[in-house]
């Protein structure tokens, strides 16, 4: 069985740029062409297929065209699976099935939580896995595939790293394994930060040890890490930032599962070259001439490397894995298949250039002049230069540690600490604001509708009384807060918000929950906590009761009356 693995294709990246608009599509077409020529059984995509959460019509049109051209044919897939996949549809002749998870760029959003991958799945072109309802627990069931050998694929779409870490630590993510999982080749594919970052990464040490291969999307540098479990970082297929991590070659990977389990990497020829360098100028004379000569030297060197690259054949990277595809054998797997080179239509690709210039004086460089001068020679003339100045050494002063970066959602939650919310969640409100900023104009409408539906469903319509409504409103708000707080949980900040709230609104149970997470005796914390507020006093029991009874009389034919006036 052969599986092509790719990730972070970012289709639609810079599609408004007349030079770079085709880059993401050309490379993705090359990848699908490799899959077709190598006659792979499956394409496994690790998230961020699209660059935008709401891709343009042009982007969707070109993407659908590529899938139809390379994945539909007369030769039917010979795979067998436990789930209904698109190659089971007799009306669509799928020859190369594609299985994909969502990333942080194309994650589900909106009222109906729809991802661009959902659209491709509805069209019968892609099989979408790894989409879960993030409430209390995630049950990950594998996609089981058989063709001579057996593979179990566990998909986990992008989740905010803090929430994912907490859910793993609390045992709220469960991988359901088949009874004879030792006889399957177990693959986990997810879209998270792997490289350690401040509070924002997910370590493979948290994952159970029965996986043979873990595929990390999201990281743009291609990398293979050997160990008890093989870790594959396919990397991106288009350069979306001009940094050191993007300068390396880009690859597609082919996993061969059989008597010998091997992993090959195929260098992608259609990726636009990236040239990075640094220039330090200490003298004030002929500054612009030095910069111009440096850029031209970078371009000439890039052309020489490109000509050498075109003469090379594709390399292979082989890794030995213990054999777990048939029976109980634990024999070490060797390596040996030879990978072929691929002939592509030659395109003239002017390079991306990034030159960092460090000036020691007060010289002035005109970026616009260089931009006009190298237009047609450089793919990004407007942002190819980064200029910094070396400041004179000043007297040493005591440095203070940098304060932790404060996000707008934290500020908003602090402001909303004194706002009386009857049904809506304060944390849900800040989350909806983030979605609104991303471009989802219906974010607030969806939040309100979701919370009202929860209250309506929780109330017994046959014998509705004001106490039932009050309890349902309180419970809905509490459940939403509990769900949203997983993303940006800051215990001490939360206690600070409670301290600033009106004493009548300080919820003892909520404060005890935060205090217990900070450590210490819960009884001692309880004595310091504020008194529990009275929900009936908060909402105005008498006034609310009259209004509810009046609405019930006016809505005798429709018991699902509106709660909007009580929010």
From Swiss-Prot:
GO terms for molecular function: 3'-5'-DNA exonuclease activity; manganese ion binding; single-stranded DNA endodeoxyribonuclease activity. GO terms for biological process: double-strand break repair via homologous recombination; double-strand break repair via nonhomologous end joining; meiotic DNA double-strand break formation; mitochondrial double-strand break repair via homologous recombination; mitotic G2 DNA damage checkpoint signaling; telomere maintenance. Residues 513-533 are annotated as: Disordered. The keyword Lyase does not apply. Mn(2+) 1 binds at residues 8, 10, 48, 220. Mn(2+) 2 binds at residues 48, 104, 191, 218. InterPro entries: Calcineurin-like_PHP_ApaH, Metallo-depent_PP-like, Mre11, Mre11_DNA-bd, Mre11_N. One of its GO terms (cellular component) is Mre11 complex. Gene3D superfamilies: 3.60.21.10. Keywords: Chromosome, DNA damage, DNA repair, Endonuclease, Exonuclease, Hydrolase, Manganese, Meiosis, Metal-binding, Nuclease, Nucleus, Telomere. The active site is at residue 105. It is found in: Nucleus; Chromosome, Telomere; Chromosome. SMART domains: Mre11_DNA_bind (SM01347). Core component of the MRN complex, which plays a central role in double-strand break (DSB) repair, DNA recombination, maintenance of telomere integrity and meiosis. The MRN complex is involved in the repair of DNA double-strand breaks (DSBs) via homologous recombination (HR), an error-free mechanism which primarily occurs during S and G2 phases. The complex (1) mediates the end resection of damaged DNA, which generates proper single-stranded DNA, a key initial steps in HR, and is (2) required for the recruitment of other repair factors and efficient activation of ATM and ATR upon DNA damage. Component of the MRN complex composed of two heterodimers RAD50 and MRE11 associated with a single NBS1. Belongs to the MRE11/RAD32 family. This is Double-strand break repair protein MRE11. The lineage of its organism: Eukaryota, Fungi, Fungi incertae sedis, Microsporidia, Unikaryonidae. The gene is MRE11.
């Amino acid at each position: 069985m052969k599986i092509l693995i790719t990730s972070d294709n970012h289709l639609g990246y810079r599609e408004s740029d007349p030079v770079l608009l085709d880059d993401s599509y050309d490379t993705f077409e090359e990848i699908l062409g490799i899959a077709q020529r190598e006659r792979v059984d499956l394409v496994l995509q690790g998230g961020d297929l699209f660059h935008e959460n709401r891709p343009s019509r042009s982007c969707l049109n070109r993407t659908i065209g590529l899938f139809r051209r390379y994945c539909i044919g007369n030769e039917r897939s010979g795979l067998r699976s436990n789930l209904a996949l698109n190659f089971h549809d007799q009306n669509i002749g799928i020859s190369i099935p594609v299985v994909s998870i969502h990333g942080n760029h194309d994650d589900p959003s909106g009222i109906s939580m729809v991802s661009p991958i959902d659209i491709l799945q509805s069209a019968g072109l892609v099989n979408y896995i790894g989409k879960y309802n993030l409430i209390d627990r995630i049950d990950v069931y594998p996609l089981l595939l058989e063709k001579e050998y057996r593979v179990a694929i566990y998909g986990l779409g992008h989740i905010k790293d803090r929430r994912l870490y907490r859910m793993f630590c609390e045992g709220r993510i469960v991988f359901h394994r088949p009874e004879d999982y030792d006889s399957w080749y177990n693959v986990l594919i997810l879209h998270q930060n792997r490289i350690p970052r401040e509070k924002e990464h997910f370590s493979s040490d948290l994952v159970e040890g029965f996986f043979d291969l873990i595929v990390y999307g999201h990281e743009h540098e291609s990398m293979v890490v050997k160990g008890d479990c093989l870790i594959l970082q396919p990397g991106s297929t288009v350069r979306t930032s001009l940094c050191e991590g993007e300068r390396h070659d880009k690859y597609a990977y082919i996993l061969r599962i059989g008597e010998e389990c091997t992993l090959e990497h195929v260098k992608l020829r259609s990726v636009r070259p990236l040239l990075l360098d640094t220039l330090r100028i200490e003298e004030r004379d002929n500054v612009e001439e030095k910069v111009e000569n440096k850029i031209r030297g970078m371009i000439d060197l890039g052309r020489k490397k490109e000509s050498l690259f075109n003469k090379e054949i594709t390399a292979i990277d082989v890794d030995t894995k213990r054999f777990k595809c048939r029976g109980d054998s634990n024999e070490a797997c060797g390596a040996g298949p030879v990978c072929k080179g691929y002939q592509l239509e030659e395109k003239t690709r002017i390079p991306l250039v990034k030159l960092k210039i460090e000036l020691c004086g007060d010289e002035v460089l005109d970026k616009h002049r260089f931009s006009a001068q190298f237009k047609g020679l450089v793919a990004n003339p407007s942002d190819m230069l980064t200029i910094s100045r070396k400041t004179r050494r000043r007297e040493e002063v005591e440095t203070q540690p940098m304060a932790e970066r404060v996000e707008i959602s934290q500020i908003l939650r602090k402001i909303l600490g004194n706002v009386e919310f009857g049904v809506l969640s304060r944390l849900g409100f800040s989350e909806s604001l983030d979605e609104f900023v991303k471009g989802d104009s219906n974010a607030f409408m969806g939040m309100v509708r979701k919370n009202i539906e929860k209250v309506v469903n929780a109330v017994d319509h046959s014998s509705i009384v004001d106490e039932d409504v009050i309890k349902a409103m309180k419970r809905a708000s509490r459940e939403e807060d509990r769900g949203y707080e997983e993303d940006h949980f800051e215990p001490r900040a939360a206690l600070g918000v409670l301290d600033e709230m009106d004493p009548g609104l300080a919820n003892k149970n909520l404060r005890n929950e935060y205090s217990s997470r900070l450590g210490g005796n819960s009884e001692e914390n309880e004595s310091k906590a504020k008194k529990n507020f009275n929900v009936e006093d908060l909402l105005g029991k008498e006034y609310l009761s009259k209004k509810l009874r009046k609405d019930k009389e006016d809505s005798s034919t429709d018991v699902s009356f509106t709660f909007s006036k009580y929010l």
